[in-house]
Amino acid sequence: MVVSNCSHIGNSYLLMFRSLSRTLKPIAPFPRHIRPTPRGIYHLRMSSTSATDPTPRLSNVLAKSKSPYLLQHKDNPVAWQEWSPETIALAQKLDKPIFLSSGYSACHWCHVLAHESFEDEDTAKMMNEWFVNIKVDREERPDVDRMYMSYLQAVSGGGGWPMSIFMTPKLEPFFAGTYFPRPNFHQLLNKIHEVWEEDREKCEKMGKGVIEALKDMSDTGRTSESLSQLLASSPASKLFAQLSTMNDTRYGGFTNAGSSTRGPKFPSCSITLEPLARLASIPGGGARNAEIREDAREMGMKMLRSMWSGGIRDWVGGGMARYSVDEKWMVPHFEKMLYDQAQLVSSCLDFARLYPANHQDRLLCYDLAADILKYTLRDLKSPEGGFWSAEDADSAEYKGAKKSEGAFYIWKKTEIDEILGDDAPLFDSFFGVEPDGNVNIIHDSHGEMRGKNILHQHKTFEEVALEFGKREDQAKDIIIEACEKLRLKREERERPGLDDKILTAWNGLMVRQLCIPYMLLHKSPQLTVPQLTALSKASTLLPSSYGISSQCLPAALGIVNFVKSHMWDPSTRTLTRSYREGKGPQAQTDDYAFLIQGLLNLYEATGDESHVLFAEELQKRQDELFWDDDDGGYFASAEDAHVLVRMKDAQDGAEPSAAAVSAHNLSRFSLLLSSEFENYEARAEATFLSMGPLITQAPRAVGYAVSGLIDLEKGYREVIVIGSANDEMIKEFLKAARETYFSNQVIVHIQPEKLPKGLAEKNEVVKALINDVESGKEKEASLRVCEGGTCGLPVKDLEGAKNLLKDV
């Protein structure tokens, strides 16, 4: 965000803030599980105004919703409404301020706020009498959430969910916060009502000022007139410097510079691992570039090693929790999000390719990727082919028990001893299991994990093998078998709540990540016993990624088939954002961009031109719906009269920026569909330039965009392979092209038995080569590399292909 514009909002907010209370006092220490919003949570003086108890004019309508998050609130005494033109018109007719609560189904603190306040009859009476109350699923309506979250972040310096916004009936916000603990929320309602009744004009004035400031803030302008000027500002070096400052050299991962605490820690692949992989392959000679490459690789790998060994990883069932509340990656916030699983697999395999074959870090990356794939394919894949969104942070230890955070995942020592018998001592030693539990009380403010254990690597395989008189491979086998026994026993517990809506954007991320292990590992041989011995020294488990990769391509194809059948309307050429018992709201930019990215990967994995042609159709529709004709780049959503600020999605978060992904897609299209090279290249450049202020001033906020600039600086290349998919040499050519980490390349496979005639109409090089195949000039298996509009001579032997791929 641009600081000057943020301060505009901040000053307006402070005026409003002072009008709410002259005697604000901070509340008790905020729970360590989430980051507080400094100015959003206060101990407010109780108003003398009391709520009356008339029959509410509105009733709770969420039972009609299809959103799992909204359905969680269908039995609240609060008269919740869905975000809609009808609801907004009703608020204006009733002339009441609006209370907007935005969250998502897997959010622990959303559940806490609901239990403490929204399920409370007295609080609900106040809310129903004084406000029109609207619930928003941020995953279905990110456009609504994004606008008000920008306000919250600008005035408080932070944000999070649940997001709580008070606004005028005209949708102009005048007060914001996140989670308000009991009784503060009750008191806040009194105070907001008092101020609205006594000084409504000031609230409305502040709200109008906020909207104008948000409009200014969303208009970032340009700092560079050309891509060369933007590259000359050295964004990659600046990004590396920022990441180096925030890097935790002891435990891995990244923290906020100057923070007094080292947690929480998020995977945040688009901000950390994705750009680090690019930096680790940055071009150029000299000591400085060599240092950046080595340090970036180690920063990313240190983070992956820590996540592999930490409690953030579900050792029993696979998959990764959303974040760790502590610096050591031991105590997770237990919700599991599909977007994290998807991005982590991609990042693991990016880093794997930065190391030689059979290097211990390469194998560790394979192992972690397999662990995540195992979980997503087993527990998040719907029978129809799409992937569900998330599993909840809260769960019950047994059916009928009160839900608490992480109950499904944590263990008493007595439980482990009973299940594992004679193997329990070795298992307990490896995972640091204690009779009284191993969770520090400072990370368990509500005492929900008292006496329980979070599994995390406490000792190495070598250490426990020595301790119990075993060989390392024996110790490893015991632990693998023990984890499976615990998983089967754990299935008797009540599983965490499942958010079973299917989101286009997140499924697009899944298509991308499913293609990568298929391309890298499909039909690779199992590791040999000597390699397993080397692996033991690296303290990793058996990389089952070699076996699980065969499931990846069918799963990716299943997603695309589901989207085409349920979420794509060919008559209007539009996507929907979500699907659950029917279509959800209209799709947004990230839905198009992430799905396009996945389809381009799917084309490279299969050689089936239908995927790139569908991607092209989606790209044209994305341009029609979201392109900014004035300043370039993409708006995050389509025009909507009730979303007062049409914003651009420039900054990365838990997911990459849709704008940055779009720029990368456009660069790939410029090669694949070279007949429109100038159009795609111009749009890619304009998209990067639209993010220019952030790229030059705050590169870490746009790490994915900087990654794309690194690719552009290296120069994109097109690897063209000609020959039958069943030809052994072709398989080796494709394997060689995929194994080396080149994020700036596209692979085109021309198969004589299935010539890509549709692609040939849009790519002159492919068209010419198809003519050569049909005329008999191209008979043998070959590989060539094209760069800058020029193709090199073909090579027809594997060694020559490897050298060519290495040298380019």
Please identify what each model-predicted range represents.
Residues 1-29:
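N-terminal chloroplast transit peptides
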Residues 7-10, 32, 42, 610:
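Intrinsically disordered, low-complexity cationic segments
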Residues 276, 348-351, 514-517, 599-602, ...:
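The core hydrophobic/aromatic register in alpha-helical repeat solenoids, strongest
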Residues 378-385, 565-593, 598-761:
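Long, polar/charge-rich, low-hydrophobicity segments
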